[in-house]
Amino acid sequence: MPWIQLKLNTTGANAEDLSDALMEAGAVSITFQDTHDTPVFEPLPGETRLWGDTDVIGLFDAETDMNDVVAILENHPLLGAGFAHKIEQLEDKDWEREWMDNFHPMRFGERLWICPSWRDVPDENAVNVMLDPGLAFGTGTHPTTSLCLQWLDSLDLTGKTVIDFGCGSGILAIAALKLGAAKAIGIDIDPQAIQASRDNAERNGVSDRLELYLPKDQPEAMKADVVVANILAGPLRELAPLISVLPVSGGLLGLSGILASQAESVCEAYADSFALDPVVEKEEWCRITGRKN
Protein backbone atom coordinates (compact mmCIF):
# COMPACT_ATOMS: atom_id res chain seq x y z
CA MET A 1 0.00 0.00 0.00
CA PRO A 2 1.20 3.61 -0.57
CA TRP A 3 2.40 5.74 2.33
CA ILE A 4 3.01 9.38 3.19
CA GLN A 5 6.32 10.35 4.77
CA LEU A 6 6.88 13.42 6.96
CA LYS A 7 10.48 14.37 7.74
CA LEU A 8 11.69 16.74 10.48
CA ASN A 9 15.23 17.82 11.25
CA THR A 10 16.27 18.20 14.88
CA THR A 11 19.07 17.53 17.34
CA GLY A 12 19.78 14.09 18.72
CA ALA A 13 18.68 15.31 22.15
CA ASN A 14 15.19 16.22 20.86
CA ALA A 15 14.69 13.28 18.50
CA GLU A 16 12.88 11.03 20.98
CA ASP A 17 10.42 13.80 21.94
CA LEU A 18 9.56 14.47 18.30
CA SER A 19 9.24 10.75 17.66
CA ASP A 20 6.59 10.61 20.39
CA ALA A 21 4.85 13.64 18.87
CA LEU A 22 4.70 12.01 15.43
CA MET A 23 3.27 8.81 16.90
CA GLU A 24 0.62 10.80 18.76
CA ALA A 25 -0.23 12.54 15.48
CA GLY A 26 -0.90 9.18 13.83
CA ALA A 27 2.42 7.89 12.46
CA VAL A 28 2.53 4.11 12.11
CA SER A 29 6.33 3.95 12.30
CA ILE A 30 9.31 6.19 13.04
CA THR A 31 12.82 6.14 11.59
CA PHE A 32 15.87 8.08 12.79
CA GLN A 33 18.31 9.03 10.04
CA ASP A 34 21.64 10.82 10.16
CA THR A 35 21.49 14.13 8.31
CA HIS A 36 25.21 14.13 7.46
CA ASP A 37 26.08 10.41 7.21
CA THR A 38 28.20 10.48 10.36
CA PRO A 39 29.20 7.07 11.83
CA VAL A 40 27.18 5.90 14.82
CA PHE A 41 28.09 2.83 16.81
CA GLU A 42 26.17 0.06 18.48
CA PRO A 43 24.46 1.44 21.61
CA LEU A 44 24.71 0.04 25.08
CA PRO A 45 21.70 -1.95 26.37
CA GLY A 46 18.69 0.33 26.87
CA GLU A 47 20.34 3.23 25.08
CA THR A 48 19.37 4.82 21.74
CA ARG A 49 22.51 6.37 20.25
CA LEU A 50 21.63 9.28 17.93
CA TRP A 51 23.52 11.78 15.81
CA GLY A 52 23.92 15.45 16.69
CA ASP A 53 21.87 16.41 13.62
CA THR A 54 19.06 13.89 13.17
CA ASP A 55 16.18 13.51 10.73
CA VAL A 56 13.04 12.10 12.34
CA ILE A 57 10.83 10.46 9.73
CA GLY A 58 7.22 9.50 10.36
CA LEU A 59 5.34 7.12 8.06
CA PHE A 60 1.59 7.71 7.70
CA ASP A 61 -1.24 5.85 6.00
CA ALA A 62 -1.99 7.29 2.54
CA GLU A 63 -5.49 8.31 3.66
CA THR A 64 -4.14 10.54 6.45
CA ASP A 65 -4.98 14.25 6.20
CA MET A 66 -1.50 15.71 6.58
CA ASN A 67 -2.90 19.21 7.21
CA ASP A 68 -4.33 17.83 10.44
CA VAL A 69 -1.00 16.22 11.30
CA VAL A 70 0.87 19.48 10.73
CA ALA A 71 -1.68 21.38 12.84
CA ILE A 72 -1.14 18.95 15.72
CA LEU A 73 2.65 19.22 15.46
CA GLU A 74 2.54 23.03 15.40
CA ASN A 75 1.33 22.90 18.99
CA HIS A 76 4.46 21.05 20.10
CA PRO A 77 6.85 23.31 22.08
CA LEU A 78 9.86 22.15 20.04
CA LEU A 79 8.19 23.02 16.73
CA GLY A 80 5.64 25.85 16.66
CA ALA A 81 3.77 27.44 13.76
CA GLY A 82 5.41 27.16 10.36
CA PHE A 83 7.99 24.59 11.50
CA ALA A 84 10.31 23.24 8.77
CA HIS A 85 9.26 19.86 7.41
CA LYS A 86 9.01 17.85 4.22
CA ILE A 87 6.03 15.72 3.19
CA GLU A 88 6.46 13.13 0.47
CA GLN A 89 4.12 10.57 -1.12
CA LEU A 90 5.87 7.21 -1.33
CA GLU A 91 5.12 4.90 -4.20
CA ASP A 92 3.64 1.51 -3.49
CA LYS A 93 6.47 -1.03 -3.21
CA ASP A 94 7.23 -4.38 -1.71
CA TRP A 95 9.44 -2.79 0.93
CA GLU A 96 10.62 -6.10 2.41
CA ARG A 97 11.68 -7.36 -1.00
CA GLU A 98 13.47 -4.08 -1.77
CA TRP A 99 15.31 -4.30 1.56
CA MET A 100 16.34 -7.89 0.88
CA ASP A 101 17.51 -7.03 -2.63
CA ASN A 102 20.06 -4.60 -1.19
CA PHE A 103 22.06 -7.38 0.51
CA HIS A 104 24.34 -9.69 -1.44
CA PRO A 105 27.00 -12.26 -0.55
CA MET A 106 30.28 -10.56 0.36
CA ARG A 107 33.77 -12.00 0.01
CA PHE A 108 36.53 -11.36 2.53
CA GLY A 109 40.05 -12.46 1.70
CA GLU A 110 40.63 -15.62 -0.31
CA ARG A 111 38.24 -18.13 1.24
CA LEU A 112 35.52 -16.45 3.28
CA TRP A 113 32.02 -15.41 2.20
CA ILE A 114 29.25 -13.87 4.33
CA CYS A 115 25.90 -14.77 2.75
CA PRO A 116 22.29 -13.72 3.53
CA SER A 117 20.06 -16.77 3.92
CA TRP A 118 17.83 -15.84 0.96
CA ARG A 119 20.75 -15.69 -1.51
CA ASP A 120 22.43 -18.57 -3.31
CA VAL A 121 25.95 -19.32 -2.10
CA PRO A 122 28.36 -18.09 -4.82
CA ASP A 123 30.94 -20.83 -4.19
CA GLU A 124 29.91 -24.03 -2.45
CA ASN A 125 33.57 -24.94 -1.92
CA ALA A 126 34.34 -21.68 -0.11
CA VAL A 127 34.00 -20.99 3.61
CA ASN A 128 30.43 -19.72 3.81
CA VAL A 129 28.93 -18.01 6.87
CA MET A 130 25.16 -17.57 6.65
CA LEU A 131 24.18 -14.37 8.41
CA ASP A 132 21.16 -12.14 7.84
CA PRO A 133 21.48 -8.36 8.25
CA GLY A 134 19.83 -6.90 11.33
CA LEU A 135 19.55 -3.59 13.13
CA ALA A 136 21.83 -4.17 16.07
CA PHE A 137 24.93 -6.13 15.23
CA GLY A 138 27.63 -6.56 12.61
CA THR A 139 27.13 -8.37 9.29
CA GLY A 140 30.36 -7.50 7.49
CA THR A 141 29.23 -4.34 5.73
CA HIS A 142 31.16 -1.95 7.99
CA PRO A 143 34.85 -1.41 7.17
CA THR A 144 35.97 -2.44 10.67
CA THR A 145 34.18 -5.80 10.46
CA SER A 146 35.55 -6.26 6.95
CA LEU A 147 39.10 -5.60 8.17
CA CYS A 148 38.72 -8.21 10.92
CA LEU A 149 37.22 -10.82 8.58
CA GLN A 150 40.02 -10.33 6.05
CA TRP A 151 42.58 -10.76 8.81
CA LEU A 152 40.98 -13.96 10.10
CA ASP A 153 40.85 -15.32 6.56
CA SER A 154 44.59 -14.73 6.21
CA LEU A 155 45.44 -16.86 9.27
CA ASP A 156 45.86 -20.61 9.67
CA LEU A 157 43.31 -21.17 12.43
CA THR A 158 43.34 -24.96 12.27
CA GLY A 159 42.99 -26.33 15.79
CA LYS A 160 43.28 -22.89 17.37
CA THR A 161 41.22 -21.23 20.11
CA VAL A 162 39.88 -17.77 19.24
CA ILE A 163 38.39 -15.12 21.54
CA ASP A 164 35.95 -12.60 20.01
CA PHE A 165 35.94 -9.76 22.54
CA GLY A 166 32.74 -7.75 22.05
CA CYS A 167 31.18 -10.39 19.84
CA GLY A 168 27.93 -8.63 18.80
CA SER A 169 26.35 -10.92 16.19
CA GLY A 170 29.12 -13.48 16.65
CA ILE A 171 30.24 -12.96 13.06
CA LEU A 172 33.96 -13.01 13.85
CA ALA A 173 33.81 -16.02 16.18
CA ILE A 174 31.64 -17.96 13.73
CA ALA A 175 33.91 -17.06 10.82
CA ALA A 176 36.92 -18.27 12.83
CA LEU A 177 35.22 -21.60 13.52
CA LYS A 178 34.27 -22.04 9.88
CA LEU A 179 37.88 -21.22 8.95
CA GLY A 180 39.12 -24.13 11.05
CA ALA A 181 39.37 -22.97 14.66
CA ALA A 182 38.72 -25.75 17.14
CA LYS A 183 37.01 -23.47 19.63
CA ALA A 184 35.80 -19.88 19.87
CA ILE A 185 34.80 -17.82 22.88
CA GLY A 186 32.51 -14.81 22.50
CA ILE A 187 32.30 -12.12 25.17
CA ASP A 188 29.84 -9.21 25.18
CA ILE A 189 28.27 -6.88 27.74
CA ASP A 190 24.84 -7.15 26.06
CA PRO A 191 22.65 -10.23 26.69
CA GLN A 192 20.98 -9.57 23.32
CA ALA A 193 24.36 -9.96 21.62
CA ILE A 194 24.92 -13.25 23.42
CA GLN A 195 21.56 -14.53 22.16
CA ALA A 196 22.20 -13.25 18.63
CA SER A 197 25.57 -15.00 18.59
CA ARG A 198 24.01 -18.22 19.86
CA ASP A 199 21.29 -18.14 17.19
CA ASN A 200 23.77 -17.40 14.41
CA ALA A 201 26.10 -20.16 15.58
CA GLU A 202 23.25 -22.67 15.48
CA ARG A 203 22.33 -21.52 11.96
CA ASN A 204 25.90 -22.18 10.88
CA GLY A 205 26.28 -25.52 12.64
CA VAL A 206 29.07 -24.44 15.00
CA SER A 207 27.22 -23.90 18.28
CA ASP A 208 28.91 -26.93 19.86
CA ARG A 209 32.30 -25.19 19.53
CA LEU A 210 31.27 -21.69 20.61
CA GLU A 211 31.24 -20.58 24.25
CA LEU A 212 29.48 -17.31 25.08
CA TYR A 213 29.86 -15.21 28.22
CA LEU A 214 28.89 -11.93 29.76
CA PRO A 215 32.05 -10.37 31.27
CA LYS A 216 30.97 -11.22 34.82
CA ASP A 217 30.63 -14.89 33.88
CA GLN A 218 33.79 -15.44 31.84
CA PRO A 219 36.28 -17.97 33.23
CA GLU A 220 39.35 -16.73 35.06
CA ALA A 221 42.75 -17.16 33.39
CA MET A 222 41.07 -17.53 29.99
CA LYS A 223 43.59 -17.77 27.13
CA ALA A 224 43.47 -18.08 23.35
CA ASP A 225 45.80 -18.43 20.38
CA VAL A 226 44.02 -15.57 18.60
CA VAL A 227 42.13 -12.63 20.13
CA VAL A 228 40.06 -10.24 18.02
CA ALA A 229 38.26 -7.17 19.38
CA ASN A 230 36.19 -5.00 17.06
CA ILE A 231 34.91 -2.40 19.49
CA LEU A 232 35.83 1.30 19.88
CA ALA A 233 39.15 3.06 20.41
CA GLY A 234 38.20 4.33 23.88
CA PRO A 235 37.31 0.91 25.32
CA LEU A 236 40.30 -0.67 23.54
CA ARG A 237 42.61 1.75 25.35
CA GLU A 238 40.85 1.42 28.70
CA LEU A 239 40.67 -2.38 28.51
CA ALA A 240 44.22 -2.87 27.24
CA PRO A 241 45.42 -4.45 30.54
CA LEU A 242 42.58 -6.99 30.36
CA ILE A 243 42.76 -7.72 26.62
CA SER A 244 46.57 -7.95 26.60
CA VAL A 245 46.62 -10.97 28.92
CA LEU A 246 44.17 -13.01 26.83
CA PRO A 247 46.55 -14.22 24.08
CA VAL A 248 49.05 -16.97 24.91
CA SER A 249 52.74 -16.19 24.50
CA GLY A 250 53.27 -15.86 20.76
CA GLY A 251 49.52 -15.52 20.23
CA LEU A 252 47.95 -13.08 17.82
CA LEU A 253 45.89 -9.95 18.49
CA GLY A 254 43.60 -8.10 16.07
CA LEU A 255 41.93 -4.80 17.00
CA SER A 256 39.50 -2.66 15.02
CA GLY A 257 36.64 -0.21 15.50
CA ILE A 258 39.38 2.41 15.36
CA LEU A 259 39.47 5.56 13.27
CA ALA A 260 42.79 6.04 11.49
CA SER A 261 43.33 9.21 13.53
CA GLN A 262 43.08 7.13 16.74
CA ALA A 263 45.52 4.40 15.72
CA GLU A 264 48.60 5.88 17.38
CA SER A 265 47.02 6.14 20.83
CA VAL A 266 45.67 2.58 20.64
CA CYS A 267 49.05 1.25 19.50
CA GLU A 268 50.69 2.95 22.49
CA ALA A 269 48.35 1.07 24.84
CA TYR A 270 49.48 -2.32 23.48
CA ALA A 271 53.09 -1.69 22.45
CA ASP A 272 54.63 -3.03 25.68
CA SER A 273 52.96 -6.44 25.33
CA PHE A 274 52.94 -6.99 21.56
CA ALA A 275 55.19 -6.75 18.54
CA LEU A 276 52.82 -4.69 16.40
CA ASP A 277 52.46 -4.91 12.63
CA PRO A 278 52.00 -1.90 10.33
CA VAL A 279 48.50 -0.42 10.69
CA VAL A 280 46.10 -1.38 7.88
CA GLU A 281 43.56 1.24 6.79
CA LYS A 282 40.22 0.95 4.99
CA GLU A 283 38.38 4.17 4.23
CA GLU A 284 38.71 6.21 7.47
CA TRP A 285 39.05 3.10 9.67
CA CYS A 286 41.99 0.89 10.57
CA ARG A 287 43.09 -2.45 11.97
CA ILE A 288 45.93 -3.05 14.42
CA THR A 289 47.49 -6.51 14.68
CA GLY A 290 50.41 -7.94 16.58
CA ARG A 291 52.03 -10.94 18.24
CA LYS A 292 52.26 -11.39 22.02
CA ASN A 293 55.77 -10.99 23.40
From Swiss-Prot:
It holds the Pfam family PrmA. The keyword Translocase does not apply. S-adenosyl-L-methionine binds at residues 145, 166, 188, 230. Keywords: Cytoplasm, Methyltransferase, S-adenosyl-L-methionine, Transferase. Gene3D superfamilies: Vaccinia Virus protein VP39. NCBIfam families: prmA (TIGR00406). Methylates ribosomal protein L11. This is Ribosomal protein L11 methyltransferase. It comes from Escherichia coli (strain SMS-3-5 / SECEC).
